[in-house]
């Protein structure tokens, strides 16, 4: 739509319930232009999604993730440009649903790639051969691999976020790409809350941000894997001081039960709370997948919730099943 002087708007209506699904196909065209060549992926193009499509580095091969309509099967295909039929090298299935892999990294001259899976009951990182025949765990244990921060290929390390003991708090860990040894926590033990990292390309340094529900973000540059502070970018001391002066009601992290299921929650009580009295309760609900409301992270001091508590309400949020709570497949699904 950019061949002419002015671009042409193309409209694609989203299919409504009961109407025919849109057909999704994968094709390629030369950078210099020409005809589109379509890749013959098995399956009805109206009954499958193309979730991801990336070139494998230093090759003419496409790495394609194809998911069925119920979203409980993710098939990985490798298709060579001009090289015949695509090959299904890996299939991920689950009785409930599967996730798309957004952080595939290629290793060992592009002969292996990283893959996140819940096949063990917990979300972990795996090392998979290019033909899909060799699948080996990089991380192991009863915790969820939350996200990959980066790698130091020379040292053979992957840096990732996990929360083995308390999913409301996030910490940085490292593991050997060969899957040997134990995972190591790198975030400081005395900073309880959530740690976020932006890793340098060589994996030697990271911009580190720490916060929790009562601590505004503190940002620094650290060296890895020692986690030694190189420089402080922003400590937010003034914001922290002003917040403390407000003398707000504390945000309490608690656990409750729904039958046999244990649920995490937080609660903010009115100032001068009297346990002998009854109070109206407001429950803050999200209730959809891929989100989480019970997190020990700075959220602007929860001023909206604090205002409601100041008006005499108890404010509560309870994590529901299906949320991104990083507590294993059985609880989530």
Each model region followed by its residue ranges:
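Serine-hydrolase catalytic core recognition
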Residues: 1, 59, 187-188, 194-333
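Beta-propeller folds
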Residues: 1-205, 211-217, 221-222, 227
């Amino acid at each position: 739509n950019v061949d002419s002087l002015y671009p042409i708007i193309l409209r694609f209506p989203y299919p409504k319930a009961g109407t025919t699904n849109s057909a999704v196909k994968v094709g390629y065209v030369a950078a210099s232009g020409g005809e589109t060549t379509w890749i013959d992926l098995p399956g009805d193009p109206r009954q499958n999604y193309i979730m991801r499509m990336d070139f494998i580095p230093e090759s003419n091969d496409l790495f394609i993730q194809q998911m069925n309509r119920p979203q409980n099967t993710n098939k990985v295909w490798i298709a060579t440009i001009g090289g015949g039929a695509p090959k299904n090298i890996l299939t991920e299935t689950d009785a409930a649903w599967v996730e798309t892999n957004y952080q595939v990294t290629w290793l060992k001259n592009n002969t292996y790639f990283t893959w996140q899976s819940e096949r063990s009951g917990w979300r972990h990182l795996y090392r998979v051969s290019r033909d899909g025949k060799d699948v080996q765990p990089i991380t192991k244990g009863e915790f969820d691999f939350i996200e990959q921060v980066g790698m130091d290929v020379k040292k053979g390390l992957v840096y990732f976020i996990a929360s083995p003991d308390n999913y409301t708090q996030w910490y940085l860990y490292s593991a050997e790409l060969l899957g040997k040894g134990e995972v190591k926590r790198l975030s400081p033990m005395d900073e309880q809350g959530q740690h976020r990292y932006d890793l340098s390309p060589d994996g030697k340094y990271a911009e580190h941000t720490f916060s929790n529900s009562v601590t505004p973000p503190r940002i620094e540059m650290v060296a890895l894997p020692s986690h030694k502070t190189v420089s402080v970018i922003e400590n937010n001391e003034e914001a922290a001081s002003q917040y403390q002066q407000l003398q707000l009601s504390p945000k309490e992290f608690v656990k409750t039960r729904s039958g046999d299921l244990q649920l995490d929650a937080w609660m903010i009580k009115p100032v001068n709370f009297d346990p002998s009295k009854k109070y109206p309760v407001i429950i803050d609900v999200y209730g959809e997948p891929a989100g989480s409301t019970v997190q020990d992270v700075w959220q602007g001091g929860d001023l909206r919730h604090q205002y409601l508590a100041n008006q005499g309400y108890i404010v509560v949020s309870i994590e529901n099943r299906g949320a991104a709570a990083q507590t294993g497949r059985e609880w989530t699904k």
